[in-house]
Amino acid sequence: MRIELLNTPPDASETRIEEQIRPLRMDAFAGQQRLTDNLRVFISAAKMRGEALDHVLLSGPPGLGKTTLAYIIASEMGSSIKSTSGPLLDKAGNLAGLLTGLQKGDVLFIDEIHRMPPTVEEYLYSAMEDFRIDIMLDSGPSARAVQLRIEPFTLVGATTRSGLLTSPLRARFGINSRFDYYAPELLEGIIRRASTILGIGIDAEAASEIAGRSRGTPRIANRLLRRARDFAQVDGESFISRSIAMKTLDCLEIDEEGLDDMDKKIMETIVNKFNGGPVGIASLAVSVGEEQDTIEEVYEPYLIQAGYLTRTTRGRVATRQALIRFSTASERDEISLFDAQPTS
């Protein structure tokens, strides 16, 4: 499988490690069983017909394996893959250059596809349906459209916010797959596999501790494993024990539920500064010093999943569970007193 990376990663060393850990075949991909079982059928059928796989939309929170699965799809199809992201496709010419360079059966992977400009997105419609693109030459009275044929290809789009996709684009994906958070038991297996690849041992209790605080997310599990490896090596250990894992998690300020410093800051702000909400995302972002998109895409999905936060039309609201955990001591006493009062 030939791979072309069209975007520069922010941290090359971390990316190289992730590529080492990343499975290359469907059989090695852990979790998302129903999703992968269906994809196996679709891929096998496409290969039997000698056709390109239908276009695939992968949605879900970050770090669950959407990019990994895009590469596996290309590998299983025996195709080359070109990889880019929505923000990089800021001009129609960039997209046209990619599409005209595709060979028959190639996979074009667009990460963060919801961030493509609408004017560029429109060029995808005819490309996905009819394998052609229409380009306007010149302008004014001399303007004319030129139609370019492109080879049949598979577009794999990944998004953390499928609700931001336009209806015309979403309708053109024949396969729509959503990722769910991973159970701790599955993450333990991912951690053990990654530790073998990284060349460091890990005991069952250490793997369990890391998995339990990884927010159901393989990317976070692998990142915590690498940090635990750092602590082990600095301490002169060749093995990640439970004590090393606990030291790592404590130093990184990650609690038993996987909440980090920013998670707690968000919830404490909603509970104590905004009296539990509702609070608008713009006000919340300013209060905690974080970008709105980051809060919505990275932090909120897990806080909602964990039962601490709800979204309403008026803004973000802390749940009762959050009020009990993140309120000040006096406010917690008031909540407990209220709960203890008999009802008439």
Curated annotation (Swiss-Prot):
Q: Which positions are annotated as binding Mg(2+)?
A: 67
What role is this protein assigned? The RuvA-RuvB-RuvC complex processes Holliday junction (HJ) DNA during genetic recombination and DNA repair, while the RuvA-RuvB complex plays an important role in the rescue of blocked DNA replication forks via replication fork reversal (RFR). RuvA specifically binds to HJ cruciform DNA, conferring on it an open structure. The RuvB hexamer acts as an ATP-dependent pump, pulling dsDNA into and through the RuvAB complex. RuvB forms 2 homohexamers on either side of HJ DNA bound by 1 or 2 RuvA tetramers; 4 subunits per hexamer contact DNA at a time.
Stated name of the protein: Holliday junction branch migration complex subunit RuvB
Q: Where does ATP bind?
A: 21-22, 63, 66-68, 129-131, 172, 182, 219
Q: What is known of its domains?
A: Has 3 domains, the large (RuvB-L) and small ATPase (RuvB-S) domains and the C-terminal head (RuvB-H) domain. The head domain binds DNA, while the ATPase domains jointly bind ATP, ADP or are empty depending on the state of the subunit in the translocation cycle. During a single DNA translocation step the structure of each domain remains the same, but their relative positions change.
**Subunit description:** Homohexamer. Forms an RuvA(8)-RuvB(12)-Holliday junction (HJ) complex. HJ DNA is sandwiched between 2 RuvA tetramers; dsDNA enters through RuvA and exits via RuvB. An RuvB hexamer assembles on each DNA strand where it exits the tetramer. Each RuvB hexamer is contacted by two RuvA subunits (via domain III) on 2 adjacent RuvB subunits; this complex drives branch migration. In the full resolvosome a probable DNA-RuvA(4)-RuvB(12)-RuvC(2) complex forms which resolves the HJ.
Locate the residues binding DNA. 311, 316
Q: Note the NCBIfam families from the entry.
A: PRK00080.1, ruvB
The EC number of this protein is: 3.6.4.-
Q: Which of UniProt's keywords are assigned here?
A: ATP-binding, Cytoplasm, DNA damage, DNA recombination, DNA repair, DNA-binding, Hydrolase, Nucleotide-binding
Pfam family for this entry, one: RuvB_C
**Start and end residues of each stretch annotated as Small ATPAse domain (RuvB-S):** 183-253
**Protein family membership:** Belongs to the RuvB family.
Q: Record's HAMAP family?
A: DNA_HJ_migration_RuvB (MF_00016)
Instruction: Note down the stretches annotated as region Large ATPase domain (RuvB-L).
Output: 1-182
SMART domains recorded for this chain? AAA
- Subcellular location as annotated: Cytoplasm
Kindly give the InterPro entries that the UniProt entry links to this protein.
AAA+_ATPase, AAA_lid_4, DNA_helicase_Holl-junc_RuvB, P-loop_NTPase, RuvB-like_N, RuvB_C, WH-like_DNA-bd_sf, WH_DNA-bd_sf
Q: Name one GO biological process term.
A: DNA recombination
Output one GO MF annotation: four-way junction DNA binding
Q: Which reaction does it catalyse?
A: ATP + H2O = ADP + phosphate + H(+)
Q: How is this protein annotated for GO cellular component?
A: cytoplasm; Holliday junction resolvase complex
Query: What organism is recorded for this protein?
Result: Pelodictyon phaeoclathratiforme (strain DSM 5477 / BU-1)
Q: What class of enzyme is it?
A: hydrolase
